[in-house]
C-alpha cells in the first residue's frame, strides 16, 4: 500500500485592490501600475517598459495621475516604476487631463530631434513610436528649429546598426545586454542632451544575443544589417516556426516575402525562451537560398559523373542500389521527429535492418546505452532549472551549445544567486558570467569532479553530448543522479537528436524507446506497422556502419543530412562512402554527395512542416513558411522510395507520421539496462605534450551558417588556450603563435593565457583555422604536442 505524497504548501499571495479609470482590479502585491492597467485592458503608452526587464522610468511616456487615500501626488508619475498600494486611485490619459497633457508633452519632446523618416525606416508599420505618436501625441509639431543629426548608421557590430537620431534613450537595449545576456558591451554614453547609445572603445557589441536588442527597440534606432531596407511588415507573410540550430526549442516566427525568407524573430513562450533567441537562430537562414543548393535529383553515370535526372530515374537507381545487398541508414541530428521516424521505419520495414544511427558526431556505445536508459521518458525541464538549488554542468557549455539554457541559468543566477558547478578543463566565458564554481580537471578526468559534490532532489545535472568522448563519464553521471535523486538531463547540440531517439533512429531502440532486444517490444511495433516481423539483432552504430561498409560487409548506405567529417574516424568514413552504393538526401553539396551514386534534394525547414523535440522532450511544431517550394521533405522522399522498392512504409505526410508515432506511444515495459563503463586510465605526459580539450562554438564553420557574413563577423576569435604555467614553460605570451600537432597533422593559432588545467590545451572544434577533427583527427582527451610556433 502506498500513501499519497504530501503536496507542497503554496504561499498565499497578498492581493491589493486598486482603482484605474474608475474600474477596480485586484492584483498581487508588488504589481506595477502599468501591469494592473493591462489587466483591465487599458493601454498606457510606453517605450522603456518591458515586462522582462527591470523598470527604469527612462522615457516618462507612461505618466499617470495617482492619489492614495485621498492624497494626490503633486506631479504625474511613471506607471512603469510604481507598484500598486492599498487605496490607490489611478487616472490615465483616458480620464485625466493632467496625464493626457503630460503624455502629449513627453511625446512632443521625444519628437523634437526625431528625424520622422518613417517612409525609409525599417520600423515603419510596426513602430511603437509611430503608433503612439498618432494615438497620444499632438497632430502638429511646434518645433521650427534644426534637428540634431548624427553620422548614420554606425555599426555597433557587424550585424547591428545604430541610427542615433532615432533613439529615445529608453535603455531597453542596454538593460537587455546587462540583465538578460550578461554582455555589458553596450551602454549609454555622455550626459544630458549629448547622451547616446554606444559601445566601449574598440569593443564591438560581440554578443550571441545582440539581435534581441533590434527586436525590442521601440523605434528604428537599432536595425539588423540583413533585413535593413528589405521590406515593410505588411509585405511579409508571417508563419510560426521553430529553430533548427540547437536543442533549446525556441519559439520563432519566420517572415517571408515572395517565396524568400527575409527575417526571423523570437516568438513568445515563457516556458522555454521567454521572448528571446540567439543570433544564430535569428540570422542563420541564408543557407536555404545558397547558390549551390541542390534542386534536382542527380545520378552518377557510367563515366562517374553526377548528372541531373528525373525523379522516376533517380528513384529507380536508388531502389536498385539499396536492394542489391546489405544496406544501412545514417541520418543526421537535425531531422524533424517525423522525418526521423520515416528513416526509422524505412530501415526496419523496407531495408529489413536495425543498422541505423542519427549520431553523426563523436559518439560511443556507452552513450547509446545511456540514451536508452536515461533519456526516453525523462521529464527534466526548464522549470526544474528555475527551481534548482544547484546546477551541475558536465561536458556542457550552455552559452555555446544551448544558448537559451544559458539565459535561463543567468536569469536564476541574477534573481536568486543560483549556484552553478562547471566540471571542465577550461573556464568558459559563459561560466564566468554565471560565477560558476569551476571544478578544474584534466581532460578525460571529469569523473573525479563529480566526487566532491553534495546533491539533493532539487539539484539538476545537465550533461552534454561531449560526455560520450570520455569513457565512464556517463556511467558516473547516471550513478550520482540515481544515488542523490537529482534530476538529470541530456542536452545535445542539434535540434533533432532528442526526437531521433523517440523515433527509433538508432540501432538499439525502436520507436517510443522500445528496446530492439525485447521480443514484446518487437511484437508491439510489428502490430502497429502491420508487418510479420522485425529484425532482432541490435543495429550497428555510426562508426560500426562505416567500418562495415569500408570492409565490404555493407554494400549500400542511405544517408540523410550527415557530414562524415564531424566524426572521429573521418578516413574510414570517407573510405566507406567511396566503396558503397550511396543514396544521399541532401540540400547542398557535401563530402557525401561528392561520393554518392544518387542524390535526392530535400526541403529546408522553411519549406516543410514538422516537429522538433527539444532537450526536454517538448514538441515544437512548425508550419510551412514557403508553401510554393518544389522541394520535398525527407519523409515524402522515403515514402516514394519505399514504394519503388516494393516494401511500403505507408506514411507520406507529416500528419500521418505524427499520428502513427503518437498512437505507438512511449514504451511502458522494461528499459534497456545500463551496465556502465569504467573510466579510462589517464595518459602519461612528457615534455611538451598536453591533453586536447575542445567544444564547438555557437558561431563557427557550420554549413547552416553559410551565406550570412554579418553573423560570421561576431564569431569569437580563434585562439589556443593554455595555462600560465605552460605558457612560461614554452616561452609564450598572449598573442604569440603556438603549434598544436599530432601524428596526423598540425595547426597554428594565437595563444590566450587564462584559467585552464596545466595539462590541457583548448582550441575551438570547428572554427576558422581550427577544424580539429579534419586536421588532427581528434577533438578531446587526446595527447598532442604544444610548442611555440
Question: How should each PLM-predicted stretch be described?
Answer:
Residues 59-82:
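N-terminal single-stranded DNA-binding subdomain of primase/primase-helicase replication proteins
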Residues 328, 390-392, 460, 556, ...:
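Structural motif
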Residues 2, 44, 344, 399-414, ...:
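A cross-kingdom feature strongest in bacterial/archaeal respiratory oxidoreductases
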Residues 374, 428-549, 648, 665:
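Active-site phosphate/pyrophosphate-binding segments
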Residues 388-389, 434-435, 456-457, 554, ...:
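Short, well-ordered alpha-helix to beta-strand connector turns
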Residues 348-356, 413-419, 478-490, 578-581:
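Structural alpha-beta junctions
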Residues 2-38, 46-50, 66-73, 87-452, ...:
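N-terminal export/assembly segments and adjacent metallocofactor-ligating motifs
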Residues 258-275, 280-289, 297-299, 310, ...:
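Long hydrophobic segments that form regular secondary structure
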Amino acid at each position: 500500500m502506498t500513501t499519497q505524497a504530501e503536496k507542497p504548501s503554496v504561499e498565499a499571495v497578498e492581493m491589493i485592490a486598486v482603482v484605474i479609470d474608475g474600474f477596480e482590479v485586484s492584483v498581487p502585491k508588488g504589481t506595477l501600475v502599468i501591469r494592473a492597467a493591462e489587466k483591465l485592458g487599458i493601454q498606457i503608452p510606453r517605450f522603456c517598459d518591458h515586462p522582462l526587464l527591470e523598470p527604469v522610468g527612462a522615457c516618462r511616456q507612461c505618466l499617470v495621475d495617482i492619489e492614495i487615500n485621498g492624497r494626490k501626488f503633486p506631479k504625474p508619475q511613471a506607471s512603469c516604476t510604481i507598484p500598486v498600494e492599498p487605496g490607490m486611485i489611478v487616472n490615465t490619459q483616458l480620464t485625466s487631463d493632467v496625464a493626457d497633457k503630460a503624455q502629449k508633452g513627453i511625446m512632443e519632446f521625444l519628437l523634437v530631434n526625431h528625424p520622422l523618416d518613417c517612409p525609409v525606416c525599417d520600423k515603419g508599420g510596426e513602430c511603437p513610436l509611430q503608433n503612439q505618436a498618432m494615438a497620444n501625441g499632438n497632430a502638429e509639431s511646434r518645433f521650427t528649429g534644426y534637428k540634431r543629426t548624427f553620422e548614420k548608421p554606425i555599426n555597433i557590430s557587424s550585424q547591428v546598426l545604430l541610427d542615433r537620431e532615432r533613439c529615445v534613450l529608453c535603455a531597453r537595449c542596454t538593460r537587455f545586454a546587462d540583465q538578460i545576456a550578461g554582455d555589458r558591451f553596450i551602454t549609454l554614453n555622455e550626459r544630458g542632451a549629448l547622451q547616446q547609445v554606444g559601445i566601449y572603445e574598440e569593443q564591438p557589441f560581440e554578443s550571441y544575443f545582440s539581435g534581441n536588442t533590434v527586436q525590442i527597440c521601440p523605434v528604428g534606432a537599432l536595425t539588423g544589417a540583413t533585413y535593413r531596407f528589405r521590406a515593410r511588415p505588411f509585405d511579409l507573410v508571417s508563419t510560426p516556426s521553430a529553430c533548427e540550430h540547437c536543442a533549446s526549442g525556441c519559439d520563432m516566427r519566420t517572415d517571408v516575402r515572395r517565396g524568400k525568407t527575409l527575417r526571423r524573430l523570437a516568438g513568445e513562450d515563457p516556458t522555454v525562451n521567454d521572448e528571446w533567441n540567439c543570433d544564430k537562430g535569428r540570422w542563420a537562414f541564408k543557407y536555404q537560398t545558397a547558390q549551390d543548393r541542390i534542386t534536382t535529383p542527380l545520378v552518377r553515370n557510367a563515366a562517374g559523373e553526377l548528372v541531373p535526372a528525373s525523379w522516376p530515374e533517380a528513384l529507380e537507381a536508388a531502389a536498385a542500389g539499396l536492394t542489391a545487398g546489405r544496406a544501412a541508414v545514417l541520418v543526421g541530428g537535425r531531422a524533424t521527429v517525423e522525418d526521423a521516424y520515416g528513416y526509422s521505419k524505412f530501415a526496419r520495414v523496407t531495408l529489413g535492418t536495425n543498422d541505423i544511427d542519427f549520431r553523426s558526431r563523436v559518439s560511443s556505445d556507452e552513450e547509446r546505452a545511456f540514451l536508452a536508459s536515461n533519456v526516453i521518458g525523462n521529464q527534466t525541464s526548464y522549470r526544474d532549472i528555475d527551481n534548482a538549488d544547484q546546477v551541475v554542468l558536465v561536458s556542457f557549455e550552455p552559452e555555446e551549445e544551448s544558448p537559451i539554457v544559458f539565459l535561463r541559468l543567468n536569469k536564476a543566477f541574477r534573481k536568486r544567486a543560483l549556484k552553478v558547478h562547471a566540471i571542465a578543463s577550461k573556464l568558459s566565458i559563459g561560466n564566468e558570467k554565471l560565477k560558476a564554481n569551476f571544478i578544474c580537471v584534466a581532460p578525460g578526468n571529469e569523473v573525479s569532479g563529480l566526487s566532491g559534490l553534495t546533491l539533493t532532489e532539487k539539484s539538476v545535472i545537465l550533461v552534454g553530448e561531449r560526455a560520450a568522448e570520455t569513457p565512464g563519464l556517463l556511467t558516473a553521471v547516471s550513478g550520482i543522479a540515481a544515488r542523490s535523486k537529482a534530476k538529470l538531463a541530456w542536452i545535445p547540440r542539434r535540434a533533432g537528436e532528442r526526437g531521433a531517439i523517440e523515433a527509433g533512429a538508432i540501432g538499439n531502440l525502436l520507436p517510443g524507446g522500445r528496446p530492439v532486444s525485447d521480443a514484446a517490444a518487437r511484437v508491439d511495433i510489428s502490430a502497429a506497422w502491420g508487418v510479420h516481423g522485425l529484425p532482432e539483432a541490435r543495429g550497428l552504430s555510426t562508426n560500426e556502419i562505416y567500418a562495415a561498409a569500408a570492409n565490404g560487409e555493407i554494400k549500400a548506405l542511405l544517408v540523410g543530412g550527415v557530414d562524415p567529417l564531424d566524426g572521429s574516424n573521418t578516413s574510414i568514413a570517407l573510405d566507406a562512402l567511396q566503396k558503397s552504393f550511396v543514396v544521399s538526401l541532401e540540400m547542398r553539396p557535401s563530402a557525401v554527395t561528392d561520393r554518392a551514386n544518387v542524390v535526392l534534394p530535400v526541403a529546408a525547414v522553411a519549406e516543410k512542416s514538422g516537429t522538433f523535440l527539444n532537450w526536454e522532450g517538448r514538441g515544437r511544431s512548425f508550419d510551412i513558411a514557403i508553401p510554393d517550394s518544389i522541394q520535398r521533405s525527407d519523409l515524402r522522399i522515403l515514402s516514394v522510395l519505399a514504394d519503388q522498392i516494393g516494401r511500403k512504409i505507408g506514411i507520406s505526410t507529416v500528419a500521418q507520421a505524427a499520428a502513427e508515432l503518437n498512437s505507438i506511444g512511449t514504451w511502458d515495459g522494461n528499459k534497456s539496462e545500463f551496465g556502465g563503463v569504467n573510466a579510462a586510465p589517464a595518459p602519461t605526459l612528457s615534455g611538451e605534450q598536453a591533453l586536447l580539450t575542445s567544444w564547438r562554438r555557437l558561431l563557427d564553420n557550420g554549413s547552416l551558417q553559410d551565406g550570412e557574413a554579418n553573423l560570421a563577423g561576431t564569431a569569437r576569435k580563434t585562439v589556443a588556450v593554455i595555462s600560465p604555467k605552460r605558457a612560461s614553460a614554452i616561452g609564450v605570451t598572449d598573442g604569440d603563435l603556438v603549434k598544436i600537432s599530432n601524428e596526423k597533422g598540425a595547426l597554428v593559432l594565437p595563444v590566450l593565457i587564462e584559467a585552464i588545467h596545466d595539462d590541457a590545451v583548448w582550441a575551438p572544434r570547428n572554427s576558422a583555422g581550427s577544424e580539429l577533427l579534419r586536421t588532427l583527427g581528434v577533438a578531446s582527451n587526446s595527447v598532442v604536442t604544444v610548442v611555440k610556433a
